[in-house]
Amino acid sequence: VKENGALYLVDCVTSLGGLNLRMDEWHIDALYSGTQKCLSCPPGLSPVSFSKNALKKLSDRSTKVPNWYLDLSMITKYWSGNSRAYHHTAPINMLYGLYQACFNIMDEGMNNVINRHMEMHLELKKELDQLNLKLFVAKEYRLPMLNSIIIPEGKNDLEIRSRLLKEFNIEIGGGLGPLA
């Protein structure tokens, strides 16, 4: 990736707050997430982080961004605080929620959070094995906080998910795209 001048972008929507992410050590140029997963916040914010290399690419851009909504060059000026640049009204209640969620993670301890996610994953895996259900993703690529289960032939995933919700108050999302 790097030898071709490309930026290394990482999707952390599911994992931020549940895994030990080492942006600098792993030479990640940009990562993005959502607050509604491992950060345990209401949905509505998208935490992002950029390396110096990514910020330089943004500032060196020679063409105008065609869309106001994701004009990162304008947003980075907003972040700097050097000049007033109106981009959006900050959702202050969401920021308070994110602050509290980060405080909760620090209070529990990052290693404890990571271990908790792994323990729950292993417990789920043990129970799935007893039911003869298999996880879709190979062990070496799995995230402990994201478990995709292969629905056995002849079973209807919607019926299974509806029953889990109705009888056990467990809500499970369906697959997306060809995996739906």
Q: At which residue positions do the language-model features occur?
A:
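Short coil/turn connectors at secondary-structure junctions
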Residues: 3-6, 26-28, 42-45, 168
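Short, solvent-exposed amphipathic alpha-helical segments in soluble enzyme
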Residues: 24-25, 49-50, 163-167
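Conserved hydrophobic/aromatic beta-strand scaffold that supports enzyme active sites
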Residues: 30, 45-49, 146-148
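Active-site C-terminal subdomain of aminotransferase-like
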Residues: 36-125
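Conserved C-terminal alpha-helix-loop-beta "cap" of PLP-dependent enzymes
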Residues: 129, 133-180
